């Protein structure tokens, strides 16, 4: 016969477990451990066995449980047991389980009453149990026997405390009825770890072995030595019953008959016995499950909310709906167009704070990278002067010219304009790369439909490539237009007269320092990369770039200036990235081979990314610091020709040089303005319009709709998993709601005055016998409950001593007298209120037993009373 209450809980817990396992999680109910604590031969193992409903633990007289037994009950469809020390063997006969426990105990402790703290781990799989842990502990003893060590008492207590200290442990404090309750070590230990008494249940065993005429009624009614959760009396099988193979069913029937027939217990028979103990423990398990439900519910609700948004699109999913694929295709294409436009035009909705979007990158190309590429093709001064001198001489031919020729200016300008084609085409290529990258990022949302994604990328990329050709043609046309007519009447053009005076004005301007406010072009952190380790190694500084100088400071407060470097004769060159470095480096050097900083001919400045390097280079260009040119030509001849010019030719070269500078600046300004406009119109805006208006038609013509909208296996699995998870979460929440409504929590009993457990050191000499207490407790309960119970009770016992004090004493005079003095204020231990509660059926022979006990009372108790009162 199993534990019916526990079997009723099994479906409830299984529902929860199934609900959680369906969402791929485990339901951690963490049901309480049930630990049985008590003295030797108190009946601990029998109590535990009755709770499980199986006969499998060793029992007998003396110390039988000599190692802790950790019994794990695990719900399973088949019934068997296995030990941790021999996992490979499954026990289906529980007699063999008992024999294995005895054998394993002897293997570690020997056969001569030895004790070991090493636990035996037993797992019992059964369809009739919950997932619980039960602990059978060795009995508390004070005197070592056999192979037991001298400190056996402390060893056992430490062992017990390890198991019952856990907050979720229920403690069954087992005390036999024929022993002293006030000195119960089990209750004392429980009080240490559970001072509020919330998880301690008193269990009184061996009620059938009490002396005739004595009972434990007041203890079981929680009037004498009360506990918060009270006491439950049980009657276990005797050793004779066990040897006679009396099963648990018959034992429970005999127990019930005992309580119904006993005059002291029949009125509370429904609150006594193993079934009531099972019911009480099962109610504690129910309470624990209910207490766990709010945490589980909030956990499930948070998961459900996180899934709501993702599941919203799947809720109305109908695989057999003929319009489903059409709707999905339209929705996907529209979403792709919206995402593409947001990434290009920018949007305040869901801004990416980790990296630049496509539109921001294209903006950087237009206004940082492209101007930098234009300045990079800046002509070399010596080469330009040589070309101008050759042009002037070739135009004059054999004649000696008196005036500066216009044709030389036009020839040089046209040659410079042609050089603009390369940076302009490179700008288009950079924009195309960003557009294609943006398309791929936007199609990532189409990953559910691989064929649709592939076709969308192909069609849009093909269109961008088509627009690339037209855009490049248009840009080349712009350059050809600039080359076709040199407009020397432009309002920004300096003209011949101004060109001749420009050199003088520039020299004067350089001689007079700028008294106005210096314009700061850029600020930021840079690392000087080539300072030797001997001088501190590479270090990060705060750099400030103006139109005249480059300064660096210790930090961004700009209070402690480290150095200021004038920009005259400075240029930029690229530096290869170090093998072990993740920094991107460029260098600044002096064209006149002078040191730029201390003993360094160049300073290497490091940034975290190539984009930062390009941005700094563009800033240096604005300040007039240009990139280094490759000197592929023979400079010796150039120098000879340059320096061999006569003064008149030199003046003409200088004039044309200034005119070329002025006109090329006008063209650069125009190209810098027209390039972004041309690319935006011919490429970006056209691509957006194509996606919005024509992409869908191209998709329909490129492939069958069914093949386009075939889901990937991963996406179908993901959708199914998400929907299953969503419904499982809702089902689990419904189950939790059902459990909450179908079960009832038992309220915690109110606190009781259990100071007797704390004062047992002073009471311990007196109370020796609980059975007797049940005979004369009516006068004693007030003594325990009230703060000053003694005085009012003194007169009552005096009158009652002769007539009602004897019945409990005859069987064990000594212990009875000691127990009678549990109340230090009552000189005579018996209270006269008992007669009214004694059933009329008390045997007439009881009075004859009273006389022997009376003489022993003064001898044992009276000498101890004064010290107790003190």
Swiss-Prot record:
The modification Phosphotyrosine is found at residues 231, 597. One of its GO terms (biological process) is negative regulation of non-motile cilium assembly. GO terms for cellular component: anchoring junction; cell cortex; cell junction; centriole; centrosome; clathrin-coated endocytic vesicle; clathrin-coated pit; clathrin-coated vesicle. It comes from the Eukaryota. It catalyses: GTP + H2O = GDP + phosphate + H(+). CDD domains: DLP_1, PH_dynamin. The keyword Cytoplasm applies. Changing residue 764 to E: Abolishes midbody localization and shows increased multinucleation. The modification Phosphoserine is found at residue 764. Residues 756-767 have a biased composition (Polar residues). Residues 28-294 form the Dynamin-type G domain. Residues 826-846 have a biased composition (Pro residues). Residues 519-625 form the PH domain. GDP binds at residues 41, 43-46, 59-60, 206, 208, 211, 236-237, 239. It is an enzyme of class 3 (hydrolase). Residues 205-208 are annotated as: G4 motif. Residues 235-238 are annotated as: G5 motif. Belongs to the TRAFAC class dynamin-like GTPase superfamily. Dynamin/Fzo/YdjA family. Oligomerizes into a helical polymer that self-assembles around the vesicle membrane, when associated to the menbrane through lipid binding. Interacts with SHANK1 and SHANK2. Interacts with SNX9. Interacts (via C-terminal proline-rich domain (PRD)) with SNX18 (via SH3 domain); this interaction regulates ATG9A and ATG16L1 trafficking from recycling endosomes to sites of autophagosome formation. Interacts with SNX33 (via SH3 domain). Interacts with PSTPIP1 (via SH3 domain). Interacts with CTNND2. This is Dynamin-2.
